[in-house]
Amino acid sequence: MKKNWYLIIAAILLVIGGITYGYHEYNKPKTAQELKTVRVAYLPITHALPVFATKELETADGPVHVELVKYGSWPELMDALNTGKVDAASVLVELGVKAREQGIDVRAAALGHTEGNIIIVNNDINSVQDLKGKSFAIPHKQSTQKILVDLMLEKAGLTEKDVQIVEMSPPEMPSALSVGQIAGYSVAEPFGSLALEMGTGKVFEDPDHLWHDNICCALVFNGQFVDEHHDLAKAFTKAYLDAGTYLDEHPKAQEEISSKYMKFNDSVIERSLKVIGFKDLALTEDRYNALVHHMTHIDLIKKVPSYSEFVDTSLLP
């Protein structure tokens, strides 16, 4: 009996010790690096290149330390952003607008790129009419790719009743096209260039002809992070925009950084970078209005967040 009491007391002391240790660990002063760390979520696509470049260009004595967090799907990434598991993300701008419409506090600061989307079909498709009765893939319903496909169909006098639109992870699209599971897809690079490299698809419509100056991914912050660490969020935004300028002025760096974060052949990376820009990353009111016009037109949103509700201009340099 006495032995049992010793075991009980020992267990209690162990629990108390663990709680005490955890308390001190939680409350111990943060290091200088921890105080300037921004956790940024991304998917490995060319649209996230400014995030990668921000990380590559950071210095030990700089104002920001970037902690990149890789995700495999947009829903998973968006959940992390909405719940504060990450502080910011390079994400489909439509997902950010939709979250804001739903009352979730996320705020955009800048675009991730200009252009950079591609529409691919298999080699037997020669007109939009040829897509009738076939499947066409997009990465997410709330996406510029979805808008582009709807505009393409509308231009040809077709609707989604004529073509089956399916959501599919971008890495799966080239192989799905090659085996005939889908007739085409709209996606962020480099997954379009990959199909061209494989010889299983061809470029179809020019996205810019469907929606001039179309926008896609954006730098979006968790609102609570901005409120609690406004200066840090602003410092990161400046570093991010500076990284975009650096990429625009150093094409070779685009290839080198892309190759580090995206495991594709050099020829795929090189081609994908020919159709994307990083110089003008401003999410202007005109660009936002065009975006929400298209989102409303195809019923992606019902209640449009105002520009000031979604874009936090206080974060701009």
Predicted segments, located by residue:
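Ligand-binding clefts/hinges and TM-proximal coupling segments of bilobed small-molecule sensing domains
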Residues: G18-Y23, H65, T144-Q164, K238-V268, ...
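Short, solvent-exposed loop/beta-turn-alpha elements that line the ligand-binding surface or hinge
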Residues: E58-V64, H209-W211, F278-E285
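Conserved C-terminal helix/tail region of periplasmic/extracytoplasmic solute-binding proteins
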Residues: T296-P317
